[in-house]
């Protein structure tokens, strides 16, 4: 049975939530494999908006949903998000939601450190959500994390907290921040331990069992591949690997378990926070895209930067992630434009290149090379059939396919999950 990885191919906010929700109808299991509660999904179901930032999208559909070991989990946010969804009428029990026992936790010390750095102590503003994601991953790599399973081992938890705070209190002293007493952190964790522990499981075994049963597994990525810690616009990236390969490490399933990688891309480009953005439009076009596309962050409410579709960037991530097909979203936002531009290459220091360099200084110097296409006046919003799209919209989509080297598998024409043109089935064996 085919399993599918969904990965963003831009800087996040590509519309993965809707696509994952749409695909989850065919899936038996939905897995989050990286990130934390710093990236949000908005699902619109029967006119009701559900905002998720930590829980997998499958929980809203009653599918078995797994938070894998590659995710850093804020236990207090977990409880809060759970309550909000339950208040909206979503039934969530340990039968449909499981959390990896070896997932690392986000604590208040991580949020403190994240905020202190972002507020200027480090001298580098990345544009993080200040939710402690980066510091939590630092502790994971530094082998001092408090993990889910530690909440169940109360006789050794205090010793682990003390070891963690030997590192954090030294940092806090250097930054002029008051030190944290181990008992304070212990009490914070005990406040929510009884609420989160029933969801804990050895999830790699659970996923292996479901795979052997022939169930379809959908791996849900957060953010976008261009924010990847290795392959993104470093240092203006997130703290985890967001490319498709992380699905294996962050879930405990091997590469042989995945049969299709579906990339998600907007019909234009957006970015939140700092960092290079070659096709950004700081003009009327950017304002048009932002207002028409309602480009404000789900988690932070921050206004997103907007620009033309960057085929160079998407093609690069298609190759790195082994993407076989693209779900193109928000085509309807482009309705009414007289002309639409696509970036087909870059120019830097007088020479042409067909990739985004790794050097941040070079990334800032690249100039986009545009191809201009005729726009369309007809509405694509809510279109359900390929044949009903305006001729120029079809030409635009076909040109994107040519430039990025893979076909468009799904085409989204509104936030509603039903408004999706189905071209290729990612779950087909």
From Swiss-Prot:
Substrate binds at residues 298-304. It comes from the Bacteria. One of its GO terms (molecular function) is magnesium ion binding. Pathway: Purine metabolism; AMP biosynthesis via de novo pathway; AMP from IMP: step 1/2. Disulfide bonds: none annotated. It is found in: Cytoplasm. Homodimer. This is Adenylosuccinate synthetase. It comes from Bartonella bacilliformis (strain ATCC 35685 / KC583 / Herrer 020/F12,63). The lineage of its organism: Bacteria, Pseudomonadati, Pseudomonadota, Alphaproteobacteria, Hyphomicrobiales.
């Amino acid at each position: 049975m085919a399993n599918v990885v969904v990965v963003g191919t831009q800087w996040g906010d590509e519309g993965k939530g809707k696509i994952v929700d749409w695909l989850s109808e065919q899936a038996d299991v939905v897995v989050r494999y990286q990130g934390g509660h710093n990236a949000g999904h908005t699902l619109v179901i029967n006119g009701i908006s559900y905002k998720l930032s930590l829980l997998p999208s499958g929980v809203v559909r009653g599918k078995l949903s797994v938070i894998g070991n590659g995710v850093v989990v804020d236990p207090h946010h977990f409880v809060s998000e759970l309550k909000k969804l339950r208040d909206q009428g979503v039934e969530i029990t340990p039968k449909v939601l499981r959390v990896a026992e070896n997932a690392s936790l986000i604590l208040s010390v991580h949020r403190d450190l994240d905020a202190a750095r972002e507020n200027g102590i480090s001298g580098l503003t990345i544009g993080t959500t200040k939710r402690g994601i980066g510091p939590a991953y630092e502790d994971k790599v530094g082998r001092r994390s408090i993990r889910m399973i530690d909440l169940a081992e109360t006789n050794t938890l205090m010793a682990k907290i003390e070891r963690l705070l030997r590192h954090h209190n030294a940092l806090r002293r250097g930054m002029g921040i008051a030190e944290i007493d181990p008992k304070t952190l212990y009490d914070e964790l005990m406040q929510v331990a009884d609420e989160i522990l029933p969801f804990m499981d050895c999830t790699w075994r659970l996923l292996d069992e479901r795979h052997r049963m022939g169930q379809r597994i959908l791996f849900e990525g957060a953010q976008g591949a261009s924010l990847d810690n290795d392959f993104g616009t470093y240092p203006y990236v997130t703290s985890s690997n967001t490319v498709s390969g992380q699905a294996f490490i962050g879930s405990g399933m091997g590469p042989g378990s995945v049969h299709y990688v579906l990339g998600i891309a907007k019909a234009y480009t957006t970015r939140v926070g700092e960092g290079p953005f070659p096709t950004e439009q700081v003009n009327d076009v950017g304002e048009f895209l932002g207002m028409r596309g309602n480009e404000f962050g789900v988690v932070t409410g921050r206004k997103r930067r907007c620009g033309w579709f960057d085929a160079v960037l998407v093609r690069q991530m298609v190759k790195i992630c082994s993407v076989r097909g693209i779900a193109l979203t928000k085509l309807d936002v482009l309705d009414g434009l007289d002309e639409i531009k696509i970036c087909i290459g870059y120019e830097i220091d007088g020479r042409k290149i067909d990739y985004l360099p790794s050097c941040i200084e070079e990334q800032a110097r690249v100039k986009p090379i545009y191809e201009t296409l005729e726009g369309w006046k007809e509405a694509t919003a809510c279109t359900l059939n390929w044949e009903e799209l305006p001729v120029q919209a079809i030409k635009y989509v076909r040109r994107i396919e040519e430039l990025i080297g893979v076909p468009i598998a799904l085409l989204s024409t509104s936030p509603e999950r039903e408004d999706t043109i189905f071209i290729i089935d990612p779950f087909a064996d």
